């Protein structure tokens, strides 16, 4: 059974070209299912049926696994069995028709426009790291990039004259995004400094030694910027979430936001409509003469 799992992971890496983060998550989830099969003395993937999987997910939920994590695991199982069926190893999918336990949907954390301005307009010291970090912050918020898209960005994907960036997203899908004027200015300052490091490849964002920045370095730098400017933790996806929320709030164009984010399914984008409603509810509560004020007595 383990050799089939190894072969599937190799297929995901070489054929599907999934990101290392996604591959690690799939392997972790499927390894849990494999351990369950071995404990239940199932010797083949054909021996796993919907009742086994239902029992397994219920136990995982009781042990504190969130509904979101279980949904991801079931998605991994479906993809795995699709592969097994195509290879002639199995003739069924035990996850077909199985849904994870429903849980409370967590809304993504965002910065409001004032806090975003406070972060980006905090002032930049005249040194290599400060200008690089400012360009990273501006580009993440300007174009709503994923962290993997930012770290994989090369010089030939940037067109500062026309204000465009081409990124390679999930599933090796490319999309072209606008780059705002503030981000362009920050990049125009950063790129000459980058050239002084004698870069080892065409990466847009490099270290002082000219090496491409990895995800962990960017996460650490953004966390430091958040604590310094806002007194709170900041992670790259928070700027992507803020980009989406602010754009939807201003434009009300869900399809356009979906295209900019690179979401295959508009249901993924719809979570930002909940954030927009929260904003509208706040405006209503503060502006409507008949809105119930906090602490006001019931009529």
UniProtKB/Swiss-Prot annotation:
The lineage of its organism: Bacteria, Pseudomonadati, Pseudomonadota, Gammaproteobacteria, Pseudomonadales. GO terms for cellular component: cytoplasm. It comes from Pseudomonas savastanoi pv. phaseolicola (strain 1448A / Race 6) (Pseudomonas syringae pv. phaseolicola (strain 1448A / Race 6)). The keyword Cytoplasm applies. GO terms for molecular function: DNA binding; tyrosine-based site-specific recombinase activity. Keywords: Cell cycle, Cell division, Chromosome partition, Cytoplasm, DNA integration, DNA recombination, DNA-binding. It comes from the Bacteria. InterPro entries: CB, DNA_brk_join_enz, Integrase-like_cat_sf, Integrase_catalytic, Integrase_recombinase_N, Integrase_SAM-like_N, Recomb_XerC, Tyrosine_recombinase_XerC/XerD. The active site is at 146, 170, 237, 240, 263, 272 (o-(3'-phospho-dna)-tyrosine intermediate). This is Tyrosine recombinase XerC.
